[in-house]
């Protein structure tokens, strides 16, 4: 084959991409991505040599003559090993399969580790040496980022993840550009300065605050602006519910991003309902195209074989869909704890590609007390690493701040957490607007009767099953149900109706899972909350007398305890309940700062250090040969796998247009973002029952559509088996 005629990809319409063009294009992108954390040469080399196995005659026969499949990714890894660059060897070997386990010198060629793959390549003796006609010989990189020297292995493994993300995203983007013949609609986002100006112009329309509550919110806002001038690092924003954290934290993020040249703002939030509301607020202020709302996850890797060849025409359908996976390239991202932290510890390419875009960002961890206890230490370690070595600023933003400073202080030289609003006691006193009381409830029927005595009332349950069963006991005008079995656009419509009825003084009785308890802007005169962790109870209390229009003693949050066998309640739900009961015995005011501190201190003490990293993630990453694949499998904030189901709506033109595109095989990032508004997450066992009863239509590569209209209730959403009823939200 003549020099310059080596092919990297082919398209469905017969076009060919020269291999050298793909290598150079990927190299330029990966170099730019890695320069954010002072590793441009590492990114450049990863991109330039990642596909040199395609120079082999065997691969060229594969792509031009439909020959047998060829492993083309191990060749570049072997070349990197020869210059003693193991991180690049691992990234290149893994760029299709996902991050491999490192392995050891004793690894077998069949075990799937990097060392095993390299042995296999040596035995196979695939000749790709003609790469020298178009590429220079690689030379050792003399300089690594300073933060890697003299550190433990966690720094090293995190650096590998960042490099891998740079390579995978660059590879996907360059391939996407070719597949779409250069017609890729990317970028076009507003600059951070433009977003800054949009926000402050919007905020100026509020005028001078006239009520005591709005004056206090203005004080908090100003403290956030003042703190934004401070050096990047770790901050906390401890403000009770109703203090205006959402806009104040955005003001901090925008001003800080301008001053310190941060490339994006990422909000990390525990509940989809808060994500939906927060993203709506930001889109209204900053423009729809500048904000990505990312929570549902379509996993194309489930159907992506580790020996997959992305270069043949018959594979282009799957390839296009993988290319459409989210990479967080917008200036403002609103996502979940699950998406954020599982991506940081992921192995699959579609989840890892976004990780490098976290670097040099302002990270707002809303409701930081919801960080999952079984993974608290690895989550904190990764947050600390992003702040210490990847130019991030992080804000722990909550109404009930857990005691996390101790854990951050153990990272490296120690990260100091700076409180933006230091008068915590004063703020708790000012924003106290409800009275908590405990009550006995012997049945859902009794509870329903209690709720019917109120014209406007909110009741929050611990499980989707109880929420649905209780709702079905309620009758009459103005009764509403909320849970994540309702697709996001459905929940938005119901919340809009609820807000309007509350404003108009009409009957409004709402039964909800805990999705409503934090960050959702509603104001009820009376609230009922099933007993839960103290932070959850106080969050729910924030939906009562939010604007201070009633006397505190008249605004009752009733905490009820339904009789249930404790051995049937999962430990992660039971433990916070028991600690709440302990704290309530010792503290007359369960919502005081002292009570909250006592609750979190006891919770973390009860769990113990080991249970704050229940899968030994940190220990396994602090060894010389980390097992990336196994760690990714074990790092699951939601233990049970979930699937997403698209809900067709006959009278919704946007919904039908999206569905038609999905059925025709059209799939890009824009379509997936729109489709998210009509998707419902279900656990694997619930998914199987829908599948077994022929209620689903399987589209390509992991997408499913509900086909039975009766399986989606217009009031309560997707009808599935409710036996596993504890409410967990993606």
What are the language-model segments listed below?
Residues 262-286, 295-298, 403:
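Conserved Walker A/P-loop ATP-binding site and its immediately adjacent core
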Residues 337-341, 349-389:
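SF2 helicase catalytic motif II
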Residues 399-452:
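Interdomain hinge/linker at the junction between the two RecA-like core domains of SF2 helicases
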Residues 287-345:
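Inter-Walker segment of RecA-like/P-loop motor cores
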Residues 88, 387, 446-454, 460, ...:
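C-terminal helicase lobe and adjacent C-terminal extensions/tails of nucleic-acid helicase motors
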Residues 1-201:
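Accessory nucleic-acid engagement/destabilization modules that flank
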Residues 8-13, 272, 292-304, 462-465, ...:
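Conserved helicase motor
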Residues 231-253:
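Walker A/P-loop
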């Amino acid at each position: 084959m003549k020099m310059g005629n080596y092919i990297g990809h082919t398209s469905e319409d017969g076009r060919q991409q020269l291999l050298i063009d793909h290598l150079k294009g990927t190299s330029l992108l990966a170099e730019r991505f890695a320069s954010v954390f002072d590793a441009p040469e590492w990114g450049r080399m990863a991109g330039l040599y990642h596909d040199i196995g395609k120079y082999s005659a065997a691969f060229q026969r594969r792509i031009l003559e439909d020959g047998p499949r060829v492993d083309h990714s191990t060749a570049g890894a072997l070349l990197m090993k020869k210059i003693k660059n193991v991180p690049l060897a691992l990234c290149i070997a893994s760029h299709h399969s996902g991050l491999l386990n490192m392995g050891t010198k004793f690894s077998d060629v069949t075990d799937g580790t990097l060392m095993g793959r390299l042995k296999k390549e040596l035995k196979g003796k695939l000749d790709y040496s003609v790469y020298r006609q178009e590429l220079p010989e690689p030379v050792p990189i003399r300089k690594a980022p300073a933060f890697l020297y003299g550190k433990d292995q966690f720094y090293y493994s995190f650096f590998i993840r960042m490099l891998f993300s740079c390579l995978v995203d660059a590879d996907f983007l360059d391939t996407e550009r070719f597949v779409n013949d250069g017609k890729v609609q990317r970028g076009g986002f507003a600059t951070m300065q433009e977003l800054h100006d949009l926000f402050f112009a919007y905020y100026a329309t509020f005028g001078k605050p006239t009520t005591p509550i709005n004056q206090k919110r203005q004080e908090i806002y100003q403290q956030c602006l003042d703190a934004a001038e401070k050096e990047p690092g770790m901050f906390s924003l401890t403000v009770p519910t109703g203090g205006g954290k959402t806009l104040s934290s955005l003001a901090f993020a925008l001003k800080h991003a301008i001053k310190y040249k941060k490339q994006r703002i990422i909000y990390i939030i525990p509940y989809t309902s808060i994500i939906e509301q927060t993203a709506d607020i930001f889109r209204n202020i900053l423009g729809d195209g500048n904000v990505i709302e990312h929570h549902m996850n379509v996993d194309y890797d489930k159907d992506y074989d580790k020996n997959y060849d992305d270069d043949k025409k018959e594979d282009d359908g799957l390839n296009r869909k993988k290319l459409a996976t989210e990479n967080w390239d917008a200036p403002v991202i609103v996502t979940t704890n699950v998406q954020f932290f599982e991506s940081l510890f992921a192995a699959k390419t579609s989840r890892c590609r976004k990780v490098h875009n976290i670097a040099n960002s302002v990270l707002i961890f809303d409701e930081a007390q919801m960080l999952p206890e079984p993974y608290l230490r690895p989550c904190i370690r990764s947050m600390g690493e992003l702040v210490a070595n990847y130019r991030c600023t992080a804000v722990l933003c909550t109404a009930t701040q857990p005691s996390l400073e101790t854990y951050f202080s153990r990272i490296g030289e120690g990260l100091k957490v700076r409180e933006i609003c230091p008068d915590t006691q004063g703020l708790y006193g000012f924003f106290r607007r409800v009275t908590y009381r405990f009550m006995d409830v012997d049945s859902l029927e009794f509870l329903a009767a209690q709720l019917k005595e109120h014209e406007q009332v909110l009741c929050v349950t611990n499980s989707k099953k109880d929420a649905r069963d209780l709702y079905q006991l309620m009758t009459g005008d103005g009764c509403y149900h909320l849970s994540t079995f309702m697709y996001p656009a459905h929940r938005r419509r119901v919340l809009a109706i609820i807000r309007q009825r509350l404003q108009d003084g009409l009957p409004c009785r709402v039964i909800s899972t805990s999705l409503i308890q934090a960050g959702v802007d509603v104001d009820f005169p009376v609230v009922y909350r099933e007993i839960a962790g103290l932070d959850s109870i106080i969050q729910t209390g924030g939906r009562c007398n939010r604007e201070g229009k009633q006397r505190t003693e008249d605004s009752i949050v009733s905490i009820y305890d339904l009789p249930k066998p404790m051995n049937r309640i999962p430990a992660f739900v039971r433990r916070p309940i028991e600690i709440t009961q302990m704290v309530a015995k010792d503290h007359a005011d369960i919502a005081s700062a002292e009570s909250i501190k006592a609750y979190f201190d006891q919770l973390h003490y009860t769990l113990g250090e080991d249970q704050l990293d229940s899968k030994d993630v940190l220990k396994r990453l602090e060894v010389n040969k980390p097992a990336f694949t196994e760690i990714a499998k074990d790092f699951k904030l939601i233990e049970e796998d979930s699937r997403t189901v698209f809900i067709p709506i006959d009278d919704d033109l946007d919904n039908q247009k999206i569905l038609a595109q999905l059925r025709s095989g059209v799939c890009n990032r824009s379509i997936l973002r729109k489709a998210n508004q009509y998707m419902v997450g279900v656990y694997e066992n619930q998914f199987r029952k829908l599948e077994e009863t022929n209620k689903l239509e399987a589209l390509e590569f992991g997408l499913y559509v509900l086909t039975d209209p009766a399986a989606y209730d217009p009031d309560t959403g997707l009808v599935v088996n409710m036996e596993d009823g504890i409410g967990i939200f993606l």
